[in-house]
Amino acid sequence: MQILTTHVGTTAMSHATEIAFGRFSKYAPQIIMHLIDDNLFSVWNTTFNYCELNNHYGFFVPVELALYTVMSPNQESFVAVNETEFGIIITQLFIVIVLRAAKVCDIEVERMMVHFEILHDYAKMVCSSDAYALYESLVSFYKS
């Protein structure tokens, strides 16, 4: 199956995230950059302001094809992940934070929950075993 992506720059970022994440899209830039600051060990040499928003699964992918070194939640180990794995991890953590903060379970919250499950299943398929283990530990950490 071919997965189509849409390149979004700074001006289109809010529109693209609004399509994927509804009213929660306005929090994406701040939360995603905070997650990167907290979890990325390697130098951040690209930006999510210029990224691919995957149209099928709805996750951000850094423009630069590279390996990113991500810290485990206990900050005792590091895992190298590719740009797709990194995008999935960061997007899922964004969704977890939004769902934890949501006060009312409305249609957009339900849509985000479904989005999380779809992307979770996709992560199982495309992530390496190390990246998937890191993904699960980070999601568990941010859920608690």
Residue ranges and their predicted role:
Residues 1-22:
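Charge-rich, low-complexity N-terminal segments
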Residues 4-7, 72-144:
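Polybasic, proline/glycine-rich intrinsically disordered low-complexity segments
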Residues 65-73:
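Low-complexity, glycine/alanine/valine/leucine- and proline-rich hydrophobic stretches
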Residues 23-66:
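Amphipathic, interaction-prone secondary-structure segments
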Residues 19-22, 37, 132, 140:
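Compositionally biased, intrinsically disordered low-complexity regions
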